[in-house]
Amino acid sequence: MAEIKNYTLNFGPQHPAAHGVLRLVLELDGEVIQRADPHIGLLHRATEKLAESKTYIQSLPYMDRLDYVSMMSNEQAYCLAIEKLLGVDVPIRAQYIRVMYAEITRLLNHLLWLGAHGFDCGAMNILIYCFREREALFDMYEAVSGARMHAAYFRPGGVYRDLPDTMPQYRVSKIKNAKAIAALNENRQGSLLDFIDDFVAKFPRLVDEYETLLTDNRIWKQRTVGVGVVSPERALNLGFTGPMLRGSGFAWDLRKQQPYDVYDRMDFDIPVGKTGDCYDRYLVRIEEMRQSNRIIKQCIDWLRVNPGPVITSNHKVAAPDRESMKTNMEELIHHFKLFTEGFHVPEGEAYAAVEHPKGEFGIYIVSDGANKPYRLKIRPPGFPHLAAMDEMSRGHMIADAVAVIGTMDIVFGEIDR
């Protein structure tokens, strides 16, 4: 009898479930995966090298473009690393705003993950539900930074500006009449905090809607239960972090274990899985959204009653406010020097990691005392996860490879850097 050779299949980078530019070379025995070889680097933009020729402030917008669905979480790690080197104290109000926006970012990330993962596995409707909520979250980004995605809102020493007292309003147009506009503007009559508070009050019911669509859905369970199982020991050895590690039953969360900003003041739980399969990781992320909602609510309540500065008063590091810059010569000089020359960071090295929506996102900076980093290293959470693709998909069907890619929550901006 003739020997049957393994069949090789190229999956991606044009495949809609490849999440950007993933190319997988799959060795198949019939429809069963024998080996999966991920080919990366198709979105490499040399971010680490570019940062060496830019001032610390000029490199900040690059962070937004690493994991381009968790923008402010990337900025947070970068700012924390610079603040460690500078020894700058961040005002407490700025820390609360950072934590609130880090959790808004977590919701943005998890909603896109849920919509895309469901869509990849054949649940078409969940994507529309998730994008409905993402729209309100983008409005929160836009209210503080003017940008819906690449915000550059976190700055070394605090945040760029305080929360606004008004929300932008929709206006009557050719496609929307006055009645429709009034309904859209209903929760935009107050401040940004009122708008976020309104969203936080509604969100648990919306998460229940997602669970109604998927959690007990027979087809969803068939696609995810028992697929891509990773034991707790193996998850640790592979370098898993975030929901990938917690889905295997290991309660590790940097917000609890190594608190930064004001996470030590927050009351929230760490969800963990039991079996370490795609279904458990789905449940972990769903519960994470509920916990993020709790944290945002605590931040809103504190920010309402505690006014104060939102960025350090050291004008060598942070720009002075617009009004004083336009009336005071010294402030104008500070502003000009900061955005042309930047600030000089003392010699040394620092590593700062945050509990990014995808796992541990770390920034390692080596400074030689100049106004630019001597070396900047980015520790992406998705890189070790993708490295386990072969192990997680071996023995499964081709269709299960899509579920495994989805459960990793891969974005190539941060993997290829």
Curated annotation (Swiss-Prot):
Note whether Cell inner membrane occurs among the keywords: yes
Record EC number: 7.1.1.-
Does the record's keyword annotation contain Cell inner membrane? yes
Cellular component, GO, one term? plasma membrane
Give the UniProt subcellular location, in the record's own words.
Cell inner membrane
Q: Any signal peptide, and if so, which residues? A: none
Q: Which Pfam families match?
A: Complex1_49kDa (PF00346)
The cysteines joined by S-S bonds are none
Major enzyme class: translocase
Q: Which UniProt keywords apply?
A: Cell inner membrane, Cell membrane, Membrane, NAD, Quinone, Translocase, Transport, Ubiquinone
The record gives the membrane topology as: Peripheral membrane protein
| Molecular function terms from GO | NAD binding; NADH:ubiquinone reductase (non-electrogenic) activity; quinone binding
Quickly give the catalysed reaction. Answer: a quinone + NADH + 5 H(+)(in) = a quinol + NAD(+) + 4 H(+)(out)
Top-level taxon of the source organism: Bacteria
Homology family: Belongs to the complex I 49 kDa subunit family.
Query: Quaternary form?
Result: NDH-1 is composed of 14 different subunits. Subunits NuoB, C, D, E, F, and G constitute the peripheral sector of the complex.
Q: What function is annotated for this protein?
A: NDH-1 shuttles electrons from NADH, via FMN and iron-sulfur (Fe-S) centers, to quinones in the respiratory chain. The immediate electron acceptor for the enzyme in this species is believed to be ubiquinone. Couples the redox reaction to proton translocation (for every two electrons transferred, four hydrogen ions are translocated across the cytoplasmic membrane), and thus conserves the redox energy in a proton gradient.
What name appears for this protein in its UniProt entry? NADH-quinone oxidoreductase subunit D
The gene name reads nuoD
